[in-house]
Amino acid sequence: MARTPDDSWDLASSVGATATMVAAGRAVASADPDPLINDPYAEPLVRAVGLDFFTRMLDGELDLSVFPDSSPERAQAMIDGMAVRTRFFDDCCLAAASAGVRQVVILAAGLDARTYRLPWPDGTVVYELDQPDVIAFKTQTLRNLGAEPAATQRPVPVDLREDWPAALRAAGFDATRPTAWLAEGLLIYLPPEAQDALFDTVTALSAPGSTLATEYVPGIVDFDGAKARALSEPLREHGLDIDMPSLVYTGARTPVMDHLRGAGWQVSGTARAELFARFGRPLPQDADGTDPLGEIVYVSATLAADA
């Protein structure tokens, strides 16, 4: 089903199911013999959602040959891809904390459990924004698990298409303090104009010294929906019915790094291959050639004092 301006979802449908997919990837990556990350909450959260495909994946009952262009190397690259992505955002959080930032905002938090699993300094407050059903499910599931947040947690149940800055302020957010912003796995699900508006709003809410971590997909401009559907057909046959072409917004959009620089941020970008190399993970030479999304660039930014 195509996106609409007022569509909504839970963690088993639409955009929400992609959050469950990402959490399943974190669970598998955490169980890797040589793990880059440790997310002990990913597996129980995914099991609680109850999507059979991901449950079978966690149980080891899913033949990895069902994945597009599968091979042992590609299967490992998928696991490593989620590991390096997670590690990048973890490291951005910890770097901001080391620099004295004590206010964190996770946009479209999904099943992100960083509030619970990262070693936050005393006094850190983490705001988690997402659809009300998503926030309620994750909060209750982690409570049922007996999980304790490692920072002061402020769930903010709000759609990012609504007045989320007002909801954030109502939860206690202080725009005069530096903030670490995370927008992980979000931008492709925003129309181009909404992406620009998001960054402009983040900038307006950011004090000097604030940081931002995100990633973008240059190939979203000419995303090949037919190729994506063809590659995912074997997954549908095994019960995973996530139609990415109907969930993402394609077409020309303002380059992320250019937009942020123009707003006063000091920006650096890291290509996926470079990130794999940083963490000692091999990347198949033609990985981007078989991925309909293509390259991924990971972005870290700091707001300059004179922005």
Curated annotation (Swiss-Prot):
GO MF entries: methyltransferase activity
Pfam families hit by this protein: LCM (PF04072)
Function statement: Exhibits S-adenosyl-L-methionine-dependent methyltransferase activity.
EC number: 2.1.1.-
Gene Ontology biological process terms in this record: methylation
Name of protein: Putative S-adenosyl-L-methionine-dependent methyltransferase Mflv_5025
InterPro entries registered for this protein in UniProt: Ppm1/Ppm2/Tcmp, SAM-dependent_MTases_sf, SAM_mthyl_Trfase_ML2640-like
SUPFAM superfamilies according to UniProt: S-adenosyl-L-methionine-dependent methyltransferases
Domain of life: Bacteria
Family in the record: Belongs to the UPF0677 family.
Top-level EC class: transferase
Keywords: Methyltransferase, S-adenosyl-L-methionine, Transferase
Record-listed S-adenosyl-L-methionine binding positions: 130, 159-160
